[in-house]
């Protein structure tokens, strides 16, 4: 693994997502200039989550909001959408191998890979409800020394 600048990785993936989707991607606040220990798969983590936020979105105007929060030793990236959300019973299951939305296309490997990579980086990933609707995926990563 190597030390990576989080804002660079995130900015590149957001640029690709904006180019590839008819959706609104907003960054709330500023992305702190922090470094994390990861590898090039960190890009895949954000790409998967940004793509999912649009692909599984049933809204006429998909909106995805990214925000980043940091403290002394970790950073949390939140990717929030205005889609159908994730039922409570599936919030842990969706990161399992081969799990996918009830009626959504795809191999179901996306979130499992996200979970696997984030765990390799010493981090954590989980999902909560967005308000008033949608899902928020949280990616927590330890800061590089």
Regions found by a protein language model. Give the residues of each.
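Acidic ATP/Mg2+-coordinating residue in the GHKL
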Residues: 81
């Amino acid at each position: 693994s190597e030390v990576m600048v989080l804002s660079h990785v995130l900015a590149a993936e957001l640029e690709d997502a904006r180019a590839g989707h008819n959706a609104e991607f907003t960054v709330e606040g500023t992305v702190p200039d922090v470094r994390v220990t990861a590898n090039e798969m960190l890009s895949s983590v954000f790409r998967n989550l940004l793509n999912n936020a649009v692909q599984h979105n049933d809204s006429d105007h998909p909106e995805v909001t990214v925000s980043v929060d940091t403290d002394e030793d970790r950073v949390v990236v939140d990717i929030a959408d205005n889609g159908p959300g994730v039922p409570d019973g599936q919030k842990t299951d969706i990161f399992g191998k081969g799990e996918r939305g009830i009626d959504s296309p795809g191999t179901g490997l996306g979130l499992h890979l996200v979970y696997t990579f984030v765990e390799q980086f010493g981090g954590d990933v989980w999902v909560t409800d967005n308000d008033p609707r949608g899902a928020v995926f949280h990616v927590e990563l330890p800061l590089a020394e």
